[in-house]
Protein backbone atom coordinates (compact mmCIF):
# COMPACT_ATOMS: atom_id res chain seq x y z
CA UNK A 1 0.00 0.00 0.00
CA UNK A 2 1.36 3.38 -1.00
CA UNK A 3 0.92 6.29 1.38
CA UNK A 4 1.19 9.92 0.34
CA UNK A 5 2.11 12.42 3.07
CA UNK A 6 0.37 15.74 2.37
CA UNK A 7 0.99 17.45 5.68
CA UNK A 8 2.17 21.07 5.65
CA UNK A 9 5.57 21.81 7.14
CA UNK A 10 6.53 25.29 8.29
CA UNK A 11 9.78 26.62 6.85
CA UNK A 12 11.74 27.23 10.04
CA UNK A 13 15.03 27.94 8.27
CA UNK A 14 13.81 30.99 6.31
CA UNK A 15 17.04 31.11 4.32
CA UNK A 16 17.97 34.23 2.36
CA UNK A 17 20.63 34.09 -0.36
CA UNK A 18 23.93 35.86 0.32
CA UNK A 19 26.67 36.02 -2.30
CA UNK A 20 27.35 32.87 -4.30
CA UNK A 21 26.19 29.37 -3.42
CA UNK A 22 29.03 26.90 -2.96
CA UNK A 23 27.75 23.34 -3.03
CA UNK A 24 30.26 20.85 -1.67
CA UNK A 25 30.11 17.24 -2.82
CA UNK A 26 32.33 14.56 -1.35
CA UNK A 27 33.95 13.37 -4.57
CA UNK A 28 37.74 12.97 -4.59
CA UNK A 29 38.22 15.86 -7.05
CA UNK A 30 37.96 18.43 -4.23
CA UNK A 31 40.54 16.76 -2.00
CA UNK A 32 43.16 19.26 -0.84
CA UNK A 33 41.06 22.39 -1.36
CA UNK A 34 40.62 24.56 1.76
CA UNK A 35 36.84 24.88 2.17
CA UNK A 36 37.20 27.76 4.61
CA UNK A 37 38.05 29.95 1.62
CA UNK A 38 34.38 29.78 0.63
CA UNK A 39 32.94 31.45 3.69
CA UNK A 40 33.67 35.10 2.88
CA UNK A 41 31.90 35.36 -0.47
CA UNK A 42 28.79 33.22 -0.15
CA UNK A 43 26.86 30.44 1.54
CA UNK A 44 27.97 26.82 1.74
CA UNK A 45 25.84 23.73 1.12
CA UNK A 46 27.11 20.22 1.84
CA UNK A 47 26.01 16.69 2.57
CA UNK A 48 26.47 13.68 4.81
CA UNK A 49 29.85 13.30 6.54
CA UNK A 50 31.18 16.70 5.43
CA UNK A 51 30.42 18.03 8.92
CA UNK A 52 33.26 15.90 10.33
CA UNK A 53 35.74 18.27 8.68
CA UNK A 54 33.77 21.39 7.77
CA UNK A 55 30.39 22.71 8.93
CA UNK A 56 28.50 24.28 6.01
CA UNK A 57 25.64 26.75 6.33
CA UNK A 58 23.23 24.04 5.15
CA UNK A 59 23.75 20.27 5.18
CA UNK A 60 21.73 17.41 3.65
CA UNK A 61 21.22 13.70 4.26
CA UNK A 62 18.65 11.26 2.86
CA UNK A 63 19.98 7.96 4.22
CA UNK A 64 18.58 6.84 7.59
CA UNK A 65 21.84 5.57 9.04
CA UNK A 66 23.70 8.75 8.12
CA UNK A 67 20.83 10.99 9.26
CA UNK A 68 20.61 9.34 12.68
CA UNK A 69 24.38 9.58 13.14
CA UNK A 70 24.15 13.29 12.38
CA UNK A 71 21.35 13.67 14.93
CA UNK A 72 23.45 11.85 17.51
CA UNK A 73 26.29 14.27 16.78
CA UNK A 74 23.81 17.19 17.10
CA UNK A 75 24.62 18.58 13.67
CA UNK A 76 21.20 20.24 13.55
CA UNK A 77 22.11 22.39 16.55
CA UNK A 78 25.12 23.80 14.70
CA UNK A 79 23.71 24.35 11.21
CA UNK A 80 20.51 23.84 9.18
CA UNK A 81 20.18 20.09 8.56
CA UNK A 82 17.79 19.10 5.75
CA UNK A 83 16.33 15.67 5.01
CA UNK A 84 13.26 13.95 3.51
CA UNK A 85 9.95 13.62 5.39
CA UNK A 86 10.81 10.08 6.50
CA UNK A 87 13.77 11.38 8.50
CA UNK A 88 12.08 14.61 9.64
CA UNK A 89 9.22 12.62 11.19
CA UNK A 90 11.31 10.11 13.11
CA UNK A 91 10.96 10.54 16.86
CA UNK A 92 14.71 9.99 17.09
CA UNK A 93 15.30 13.12 14.97
CA UNK A 94 14.43 15.29 17.99
CA UNK A 95 13.29 18.13 15.75
CA UNK A 96 16.81 18.66 14.40
CA UNK A 97 16.04 17.92 10.72
CA UNK A 98 14.20 20.29 8.37
CA UNK A 99 12.25 19.14 5.31
CA UNK A 100 14.02 19.57 1.97
CA UNK A 101 11.94 22.30 0.26
CA UNK A 102 9.82 21.03 -2.64
CA UNK A 103 11.81 17.80 -2.29
CA UNK A 104 12.75 16.33 -5.71
CA UNK A 105 13.72 13.07 -3.95
CA UNK A 106 17.27 13.16 -5.28
CA UNK A 107 20.47 12.01 -3.61
CA UNK A 108 21.74 14.27 -0.84
CA UNK A 109 24.40 16.13 -2.84
CA UNK A 110 21.95 16.92 -5.62
CA UNK A 111 19.29 17.90 -3.08
CA UNK A 112 21.85 20.46 -1.90
CA UNK A 113 22.20 22.23 -5.25
CA UNK A 114 18.44 21.93 -5.76
CA UNK A 115 17.84 23.76 -2.48
CA UNK A 116 20.42 26.44 -3.27
CA UNK A 117 18.20 27.31 -6.24
CA UNK A 118 15.06 27.26 -4.10
CA UNK A 119 16.78 29.68 -1.73
CA UNK A 120 17.18 32.10 -4.63
CA UNK A 121 20.83 31.73 -5.61
CA UNK A 122 21.55 32.42 -9.28
CA UNK A 123 25.28 31.64 -9.26
CA UNK A 124 25.95 28.14 -7.96
CA UNK A 125 29.42 26.57 -7.82
CA UNK A 126 29.82 22.82 -7.39
CA UNK A 127 32.97 21.37 -5.79
CA UNK A 128 33.64 17.66 -5.39
CA UNK A 129 30.89 16.70 -7.84
CA UNK A 130 32.26 13.91 -10.02
CA UNK A 131 28.75 12.69 -10.92
CA UNK A 132 29.44 8.97 -11.13
CA UNK A 133 31.09 6.00 -9.47
CA UNK A 134 34.16 4.46 -11.03
CA UNK A 135 33.80 0.78 -10.12
CA UNK A 136 35.22 -1.76 -7.68
CA UNK A 137 38.38 -0.76 -5.85
CA UNK A 138 38.23 2.87 -7.00
CA UNK A 139 37.97 5.92 -4.74
CA UNK A 140 34.48 7.33 -5.25
CA UNK A 141 34.02 9.36 -2.09
CA UNK A 142 36.39 11.10 0.32
CA UNK A 143 34.67 9.30 3.21
CA UNK A 144 34.57 5.88 1.55
CA UNK A 145 35.24 3.10 4.07
CA UNK A 146 34.33 5.23 7.12
CA UNK A 147 31.28 5.03 9.41
CA UNK A 148 27.98 5.02 7.47
CA UNK A 149 29.76 4.52 4.13
CA UNK A 150 31.41 1.12 3.97
CA UNK A 151 33.65 -0.22 1.24
CA UNK A 152 33.18 -0.04 -2.52
CA UNK A 153 32.87 -3.71 -3.40
CA UNK A 154 31.14 -4.08 -6.75
CA UNK A 155 31.58 -3.01 -10.36
CA UNK A 156 28.24 -1.28 -10.74
CA UNK A 157 28.43 2.14 -12.39
CA UNK A 158 25.72 4.56 -11.31
CA UNK A 159 25.12 7.59 -13.49
CA UNK A 160 21.79 8.81 -12.13
CA UNK A 161 23.52 11.72 -10.42
CA UNK A 162 24.55 13.22 -13.75
CA UNK A 163 21.03 12.88 -15.15
CA UNK A 164 19.62 14.74 -12.16
CA UNK A 165 22.05 17.59 -12.73
CA UNK A 166 21.18 17.77 -16.43
CA UNK A 167 17.50 17.87 -15.48
CA UNK A 168 18.27 20.74 -13.10
CA UNK A 169 19.86 22.76 -15.92
CA UNK A 170 16.58 22.54 -17.85
CA UNK A 171 14.40 23.31 -14.83
CA UNK A 172 16.27 26.49 -13.91
CA UNK A 173 17.68 28.06 -17.09
CA UNK A 174 18.04 31.39 -15.23
CA UNK A 175 20.59 29.91 -12.78
CA UNK A 176 24.30 29.63 -13.67
CA UNK A 177 25.96 26.37 -12.60
CA UNK A 178 29.75 26.09 -12.51
CA UNK A 179 31.48 22.75 -11.87
CA UNK A 180 34.96 23.18 -10.37
CA UNK A 181 37.29 20.37 -11.45
CA UNK A 182 41.01 20.22 -12.27
CA UNK A 183 40.83 17.07 -14.37
CA UNK A 184 37.30 16.87 -15.75
CA UNK A 185 36.34 13.55 -17.34
CA UNK A 186 34.93 13.68 -20.84
CA UNK A 187 31.28 13.55 -19.76
CA UNK A 188 31.66 16.85 -17.86
CA UNK A 189 32.22 18.50 -21.24
CA UNK A 190 28.69 17.45 -22.22
CA UNK A 191 26.55 18.70 -19.35
CA UNK A 192 23.88 20.13 -21.64
CA UNK A 193 21.44 17.86 -23.46
CA UNK A 194 19.21 18.97 -26.31
CA UNK A 195 19.27 22.76 -26.57
CA UNK A 196 22.33 24.28 -24.90
CA UNK A 197 20.92 26.84 -22.47
CA UNK A 198 24.35 28.30 -21.76
CA UNK A 199 23.91 28.03 -17.99
CA UNK A 200 26.68 25.54 -17.21
CA UNK A 201 30.47 25.52 -17.43
CA UNK A 202 33.51 23.76 -15.98
CA UNK A 203 36.46 25.69 -14.50
CA UNK A 204 39.73 24.72 -12.84
CA UNK A 205 40.50 25.42 -9.20
CA UNK A 206 42.98 28.11 -10.32
CA UNK A 207 40.18 29.89 -12.19
CA UNK A 208 37.86 29.40 -9.23
CA UNK A 209 40.35 31.08 -6.88
CA UNK A 210 39.80 34.29 -8.88
CA UNK A 211 36.09 34.11 -8.03
CA UNK A 212 36.95 33.89 -4.34
CA UNK A 213 39.40 36.79 -4.46
CA UNK A 214 38.25 39.14 -7.24
CA UNK A 215 40.68 41.95 -8.09
What are these regions (language model features)?
Residues 1-215:
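Metal-ion/cofactor- or nucleotide/acyl-coenzyme-handling active-site neighborhoods
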Amino acid sequence: KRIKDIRWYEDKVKAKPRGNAYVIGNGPSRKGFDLKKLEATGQTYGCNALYRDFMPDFIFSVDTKMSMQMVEDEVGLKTAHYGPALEVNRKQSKGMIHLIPHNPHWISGNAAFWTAGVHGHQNIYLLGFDFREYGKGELNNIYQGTDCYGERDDDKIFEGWLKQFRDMLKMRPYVNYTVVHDNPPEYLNHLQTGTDLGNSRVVSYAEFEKVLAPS
